[in-house]
Amino acid sequence: MDWKAWMDAFLPALLEAFPRRVAFVGIQGSYGRGEAGPDSDVDLVVVLDELGEAELTACRALLAQMPFADRTCGFFCDRAALAAWPAFDALQLKLDTLPVYGSLEGLLPPMGQEALEQAVRAGASALYHAACHTALFDACPEEALPALQKAAFFALRLAHYRRTGRYVAARRELLPLLEPGERALLEDGCTLPALMAWAKQEMAR
């Protein structure tokens, strides 16, 4: 699917549904990274001036009329909610979103180095817990590894950004920049204890 052609149909319809009320529209996820496959979701970011029951109903109806409606998902919010969003989480939104209409500047909460530190620790701690939970409670832990490695990829992006000051969104571009031990977390042969060990190390930095 050509996400730009999809967006060329969606954006005018959204602007018509909410005249002078759309603050920002962007794309994130695999399409934003340039890594989409034939079954990838259309991962939207939409910021309105207000988002309540009426707006949710209108957005749902609009999305239902779009091609590939069953593959749309994303982050919808209003200005006030985004301004109050935890900075470490908003940082990830900023880094991972490709703008299509408007700008996130002026909409996001203040964020600095501490937000990045918190984002890395949050991603690492979530990975640690998920790997530990899988090892203890999943009937077939090895089947959960691909999903855990995807979570590790997101955490590794932030850790690399903290280490180098350069944010690299795409997996194919990030892999050669990682340390060998980090790269192994995304390759065949990765283990749950290895994911936990790396996550614990990043939380302690």
Which residues make up each language-model segment?
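Catalytic core of pol beta-like nucleotidyltransferases
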Residues: 1-16, 20, 32-38, 49-205
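Short acidic/polar active-site loop segments enriched in Thr and Asp
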Residues: 23
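N-terminal loops that bind phosphate or other acidic moieties
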Residues: 43
